A protein has these predicted regions:
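Conserved short alpha-helical segments that host acidic/polar catalytic motifs at enzyme active sites
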Residues: 1-169
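Single conserved hydrophobic/aromatic residue that forms the stacking wall/gate
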Residues: 167-170, 174-178
Length: 178
């Protein structure tokens, strides 16, 4: 189980994400993280442990204000609780947070390794973000659709590109606020 939050707007994305994650922390307290759009790309900050650890890390970093981002609290399923297994998982052009289980992540990972991708974590989410990256040809939505066509499993995920935030789920019980 995990908590996922995404935000696009005029307020500080970092603060909105942290406030949202605080309300969802009961859904996962093994780790927490955020990905925020910045002028030069996407900045990911994550940590093992409760949300308070992430808050402290973000206070120390004093990042420039962002108006778009995604956040995640994690209850570990694939991979032990650690900084490297924490979400968001990223490539230079895309970052994702994910709740669910990708059943065929092992086979997908082998194909991605054959294409030259490397992996640092033990998570199915890192496989998913690199799969989306491998499908990217300039159009974020098409990359996401192409990647999900290869996936077996359950998912709710927020996908952040520098200029685009997408959300998708295979379930009907999501809560989305506007």
């Amino acid at each position: 189980m995990c908590g996922i939050v995404g935000y696009v707007g005029m307020r500080s994305a970092q603060q909105v994400l942290l406030d949202g994650l605080e309300k969802l922390e009961y859904r996962g307290y093994d780790s927490a993280g955020v990905a925020l759009t910045q002028r030069d790309g996407i900045r990911v900050v994550k940590s093992k442990g409760r949300l308070s650890t992430l808050r402290s890390k973000l206070e120390e970093l004093a990042l420039p204000q962002s108006s778009c981002g995604i956040g995640h609290t994690r209850w570990a399923t694939h991979g032990e609780p650690s900084d490297v297994n924490s979400h968001p998982h990223s490539t230079p052009r895309v970052s994702i947070v994910h709740n669910g289980i990708i059943e065929n992540y092992g086979a997908l990972k082998e194909r991605l390794i054959a294409k030259g991708y490397t992996f640092a974590s033990e998570t199915d989410t890192e496989v998913l973000v690199k799969l989306i990256d491998s499908c990217y040809q300039g159009e974020p939505l098409q990359a996401l659709q192409a990647a999900l066509a290869k996936v077996r499993g359950s998912y709710a995920l927020a996908v952040l590109f520098k200029d685009c935030l997408l959300y998708t789920s295979d379930a009907a019980d999501d809560l989305i606020g506007v």
